[in-house]
Amino acid sequence: MARTTPIERYRNIGISAHIDAGKTTTTERVLFYTGVSHKIGEVHDGAATMDWMEQEQERGITITSAATTAFWSGMGKQFQPHRINIIDTPGHVDFTIEVERSMRVLDGAVMVYCAVGGVQPQSETVWRQANKYKVPRIAFVNKMDRTGANFLRCVEHIKTRLKGNPVPLQLNIGSEENFKGVIDLVKMKAINWSEADQGVSFDYEDVPAELLEKAQEMRMTLVEAAAEASEDLMEKYLGGEELTEEEIKKALRQRVLNNEIILVTCGSAFKNKGVQAMLDAVVDYLPAPTDVAAIDGLKLDGETKDERHASDDEPFAALAFKIATDPFVGNLTFFRVYSGVVNSGDSVLNSVKEKRERFGRIVQMHANKREEIKEVRAGDIAAAIGLKDVTTGDTLCDEKAPIILERMEFPEPVISIAVEPKTKADQEKMGLALGRLAQEDPSFRVWTDEESGQTIIAGMGELHLDIIVDRMRREFKVEANVGKPQVAYRETIRNTVKDIEGKHAKQSGGRGQYGHVVIDMYPLEEGKAYEFVNDIKGGVIPGEFIPGVDKGIREQLKSGPLAGYPVMDLGVRLHFGSYHDVDSSELAFKIAASMAFKAGFMKANPVLLEPIMKVEVETPEDYMGDVIGDLNRRRGLIEGMEDGPSGKIVRALVPLAEMFGYATALRSATQGRASYAMEFAKYHDAPTNVAQAVIEERKSK
């Protein structure tokens, strides 16, 4: 089967935003204008096409990033049909993992901001992730019809809060209830969308006289930004020549692809204005798969570099970026094809697990409707039904040309709770349900506490875990009791200790056991986790026993000597020891290493680390004192304050242990008028009194 849309006419984009900036409504309008869904779904009444899990409809927030395919030929039918694959991304901080995961497989992104709220805390997180994966982006300032809407303030926020380089592509005509349309600064025409057909048809009109001066000034900025793309254009521009519309667009596109500028558009998705022109900007300025650098990978040895270009002629390589459980067909594995072609029925290699997988059926998703297709090609995003052993971040590739595409990094959970099934019958179902959910979401972990025998679930925040428990009830019909949230503390050392000895010797008839190690232990910088350096000279410990030393230490890292919490940011150097020809074994060295580790750890100024959250509270000014006082009582460190759209914004760093139940406390302190967002910032030494209380509580169990 030949390719139906040339790969140059593909756009793989994410639409991403702060919660409530109107992203789902924006996506709905995109689907409506591209002719996919003929009735616009409103989030207000819980009928949006993209939000397909029951809970999302109830809470009105998007949880799973559904992938949808749509076609667009321009609002004036000025393009050949372009295939736009949209990945809807959640805006709530507890689901940042979903955003990270989708950023990994996008080529470009549309950042949706609220014209009233501007750039909010979650937008910064999403922005950082887009920077990390070098995703070119444009911005859409939504909700221009709302009281307090201000387009240019939002543009300013992109510069000051996100350190981006925004260049408006449009200027709004009126705002709040007088929002009429936009001025296209490239064409210097006003766009007026028809209300009769929900904005499908439109007219170009002259720029309103009262906005002409402002529009000309903004167009100059836009043309200057375009001229900076090349020396030839700059010469032409400085020589007083007009740049053609074609030249301006081409130059702006180049600068967006290089991540040098952010083009900003505006509108009101709810009022059917502006989304159409934003879609044109997606085609004009965001990259096709062929505009993006080849994707890097490694050969199966894990060391030799390899890469794949966006071409049907290269060997098949794809990345699984999401697993979803579907009530009718079981597991759906969403994947992005980077190169090559695969047909349903083909066998491929999961190179991360080194297992064969067979593509049974392949479906293209439209939110929660699916169309079965026979093949997928480079640039496509689709879902496979019936893959057995694929988890998020795995590579699927041609068996004859294996490659491992870079793995995604997933954050460690910061909060855990114990869950117990309400009845014996729920016990088995709960294990199955949690296993399924953990396969879908790598930032969610499940384990059994060895001491208490309880099942522990851990995730990125209270809301994250609420939703997991809720999904167990709805999708798997498992009723569970939930314990009190527990903080994920960590342990580390602050000093270096040298020549710590660990000796395990048992000689009591028959074959004995003998292992003897001498190690140094030292702190590592934050985020380095663990390193093991083998400095054995002259074979005082034979090579085959060295992995045993590493294993012994790794096992101890899972449960530190201080209070049994995982150990992080610590290095070990093995530099001396001894062995016995007959009695030494890997196990003996493993035991010796763990003895040395325990002894050394307690001498190296051990500390308990607690997770610190970045908290941002938006509050009316009247309650500012109460909010700050409360954050101080919670051991918060106030970082700064600034004006927000509806009062003041307070930024603080607060230990997670002090933030439980904060939502309720904030509501009652401000009569429900303040809101807050929080995300994990870092681990930090817990104060002595806190650390002692935590350690004593652990020991009393």
Swiss-Prot record:
GO cellular component: cytoplasm
Organism, scientific name: Aeromonas hydrophila subsp. hydrophila (strain ATCC 7966 / DSM 30187 / BCRC 13018 / CCUG 14551 / JCM 1027 / KCTC 2358 / NCIMB 9240 / NCTC 8049)
Pfam families: EFG_C, EFG_III, EFG_IV, GTP_EFTU, GTP_EFTU_D2
One annotated GO biological process: ribosome disassembly
Record-stated family: Belongs to the TRAFAC class translation factor GTPase superfamily. Classic translation factor GTPase family. EF-G/EF-2 subfamily.
Known function: Catalyzes the GTP-dependent ribosomal translocation step during translation elongation. During this step, the ribosome changes from the pre-translocational (PRE) to the post-translocational (POST) state as the newly formed A-site-bound peptidyl-tRNA and P-site-bound deacylated tRNA move to the P and E sites, respectively. Catalyzes the coordinated movement of the two tRNA molecules, the mRNA and conformational changes in the ribosome.
Sequence positions that bind GTP: 17-24, 88-92, 142-145
Record-annotated tr-type G domain positions: 8-290
Keywords annotated in UniProt: Cytoplasm, Elongation factor, GTP-binding, Nucleotide-binding, Protein biosynthesis
Signal peptide region: none
Lineage, highest ranks first: Bacteria, Pseudomonadati, Pseudomonadota, Gammaproteobacteria, Aeromonadales
CDD domains from the UniProt entry: EF-G (cd01886), EFG_III (cd16262), EFG_mtEFG1_IV (cd01434), EFG_mtEFG_C (cd03713), EFG_mtEFG_II (cd04088)
Protein name: Elongation factor G
SUPFAM superfamilies: EF-G C-terminal domain-like, P-loop containing nucleoside triphosphate hydrolases, Ribosomal protein S5 domain 2-like, Translation proteins
